[in-house]
């Protein structure tokens, strides 16, 4: 995971102005700017099917392992806190949206509480609903 983040940061350094957006209509969109990474998930079931179809068998095992880990909100937030520290050190912010609504902000611009340092949950119900869809 850290290796992939480093590649993403390297790519972000190439962006001086503007942003890049990759979108699969009604499924998923990824926006990358100099300091922000925004993911908007519209259809989790279809996204999971696409990810499983295009990934290699070894990557598919890693994907399934990752998806199993995020089934629980507590485990999900634990993983997010590890990533948050890396993002803060690189002055980057990750924004997760579910059906167009911000549900989670992680990293430099997040202002979490005492227990969730560098993580801000903006919509708890939508986040839980999204995680429940990942389970099914």
Curated annotation (Swiss-Prot):
Name recorded for this polypeptide: Uncharacterized protein MJ1540
Natural source organism: Methanocaldococcus jannaschii (strain ATCC 43067 / DSM 2661 / JAL-1 / JCM 10045 / NBRC 100440)
